[in-house]
Amino acid sequence: MEKTTPIENIIEFGDNRATMKKWAEQGVKVQTCITSPPYYGLRDYGTAKWEGGNDPNCQHIKDESKTKKFGNEEFNKNAPSREQTKTPSYYYEHKCELCGATKEDGQLGMEKTPEEFIENMVDVFRHVKNILADDGTLWINIGDSYAGSNSVASNNGRAGFGNTREKVVNRTGDGIKPKDLIGIPWMLAFALRQDGWYLRQDIIWHKPNPIPESVKDRCTKSHEYIFLLSKQERYYFNYEAIKEPLADESRTNFQSGSGSFVVNEDHKDNDLSEKSKNVVYDSRNKRDVWSVNVRPYKGAHFATYPMELIEPCVLAGSKPGDIVLDPFMGSGTTAQVAKRHDRKYLGCELNPNYGSLQEERIKSENWGDPVNPEDPIFKFE
C-alpha cells in the first residue's frame, strides 16, 4: 500500500474555501482555528487577475497620483507585491476603462455591502467547521470599519494590527449613514451564531499603545475583539494552560478569609471554609480583557497580530501535536506560535508572495520588534 503524506505543517496558496473543501474530502481534522480576516472595505491587496484588454502593461488604476505605499520601508523593499497595495477606490472595480480588461478577484473584504461581506465570511467558516474536530474551537480577531462618503482611508491592512480610522467605507448597506461605525465584529458574531456556531465569549484586545488617529469628534480606538466560538456545546478548553498570576493583595485576602469564594455546595453562604482559608492561591482564571501592545514585525505588512495575543488561544484551544488552522495565514503568525508550542499548523493564503516571509517567520524565534513610539506607524497622517 502506498504511504500517504500527512496533511500538516503546510500553507496552501489560493482560494481558502476551495482548499478547505479539498482537505475535508481528504479527511483532514484540525483541533482549533485561530485567524484574523481582512477588514471590510479597507485594502485591495492586488490579488485580482485581469482578463482581456488591449494593454498588457495596464495597472488598472483610476488615479496614479493617489497611490500610497505602506510606511514600512523594510517591508516595501522585501515584498514588492504588497508595495502595490492600494486603497480599493484607486482601482477600477469590475472593468478597466483604460484598457477594457475585466476583473476576476477571489479576495474577501471588497464586497459592495457589509451584508455581502458577512455572508462570505459565514461561508468561509462553514468550510472551517467541516474540518474542525467535534470538540474544536474557533477564535476570530476582527476589526471594525466606519462608513463615509469619501474613499476608503488608510487602515494599514487586515484586522489585527491597525486601528479603525475615519473616512473609511463608501460601500454601505441599509440604514448605514456616513460616519456610522458599521459594527462588523458583532454582525459576524451574530451571523455565525445563527449559522449554528456556539458564541461563547467576546474577548477584548486592549492596546496600551494604540495607533494615533486624527479624528476630533470621538475617542481614539484602542481595542479590538476576539470571539471564541465552538462547534458543539462541550468542547476542549484548557483553562489551566492560560491561568494568570494572582495579585499579591488577592492572595492575602484569600488566605485571611477576607474575600468570598464558593468552594462547594456545602458553603452556600459564599464564605471560605476553614480548610480553604489556609490555602494560598497563586493564579486565577484568565480574564477577558487582554492587554497586548501593538508590535511591528520587520518585513511584515502592518496587519500581523502580536504573537502574545494569540498564544493563549493556541494553549487553551489545543494540545501538543494538535493541528492549528488559519484560513487567512498572511505573514505566518499563527503558524509561528503553533510551532513554538509543539503544535502542527495548516494555513491558506490568497497571495503567494507571502511564501518567503512565512517561511522566515516559522523558522524564527523572534516574537516581533521592540515597540518604538517613534515608529512612523504610530504617526497619523
Predicted regions and their residues:
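S-adenosyl-L-methionine-dependent nucleic acid methyltransferase catalytic domains
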Residues: 1-381
